[in-house]
Amino acid sequence: EVTGSCNLVIVNYPNGEKTRFIVDCGLFQESDYSQYNASFPFNAENIEFCVVTHNHVDHTGRLPLLVKKGFTGEIYTSKATAILLPLALADSYKVLKDVAKRNNAKQLYSESDVAETLRHVSATDYFTKSVDINPNIRLTMFKNGHLIGAALILIQVRYKGYPNINLLFTGDYNNKNIFSNIPKLRKAVKTLPLTIIQESTYGTTNSDEVTECFEENVLNCIKSGGTVVNMAFSLGRFQEILYKLKTMQDE
């Protein structure tokens, strides 16, 4: 299901101390799962930091709820995601407000929760600069073609006298993007002993077949005198459709 992405990581150090953090904090969108939106399976006050892979509501939509419930740490994103996040969260708020009104239910979070959430955002460069979040944890982001601002997240856990633990979170991954050059993951990263946490929503999708089918359907519709209506349900999709239609027009 494309919904509610939120990975809790608990690091247990040899001295008995712990670090708790999450990667993404998404909204459950399907009605069958909406009952899970109101709470977390952890105490938000105990989460030291959050890292965001990309700016889609199923990965960011509950960030204001996290803050509302007591989270006080940093929210690490790429620079592009930091720019787009206010728009995405404002849209999420409006949608949730309408849903709550229709169902005569309590709203998940307020506009002030959204504003407070944005004050926690810390924008990070891709791969040129790692962030030492604390003495034991280093964060590095790498470009991901899923959407502008999307990132592969490398978390390295370090403790003196012990080998590093390297966690790679892919988010929704794509190795290409029509608006941006996506470099291959560096050899220095690929040769690390990695634990990879991978999203697999589109893992069996052949994108070339989808593109060919789209072109064929659009052309057939136009030739028969019809009108093409394209539904674009998330950030990035709409821009890709417009670009594709312009390319077809030029050809």
Regions inferred by a protein language model and the residue ranges of each:
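His/Asp/Glu-rich metal-coordinating catalytic cores
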Residues: 1-51, 56-60, 65-240, 246-249
